[in-house]
Amino acid sequence: MSLLWLLSIGGTANATDWYYVGPDASGNQLFIDNDSVQKSDYDALLWLRVNELGGDELRYKVYISRYNRTMETLKVDAYMADGTPYENVEYNENPEPIEGNTNGQAIYNLLWQ
C-alpha cells in the first residue's frame, strides 16, 4: 500500500462508526474511526478521537508501521465542546516507538492481534 495514497484519506467530519479503545493515563476517552482504517499486513492509517475531560475533542490522523512498531501523528484537528473547530495542525515529525502498556500498544493490538 502506498504511503502517498494513505496520506490522501480525508477527514472525519462525518464519522459514525467510532470504536472505543479505552481511557488514556489522564482519563481522556479514546476511539478509532472504523470507517477510516486503511490497513495492510505492513502498516495502517486511521483517525483517532480523544474526548478530553474538559469537553474538547481532538482527532489525530495517525500512521502505524506494524513491523517497525512505530506510530506517527500526521494531523490534529481540535474542536471545542460545542463542536466548533479551533485548530488544525499538519505534522512532519519522526515516528515514535510503540511500547509497553500504552495507547499505541492498545491500538496496535486491535489492528493486528
Language model features: what each stretch is:
Residues L4-T12:
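C-terminal segment of classical bacterial N-terminal signal peptides
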Residues G11-Q113:
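N-terminal secretory-pathway/extracellular module detecting exported/lumenal segments
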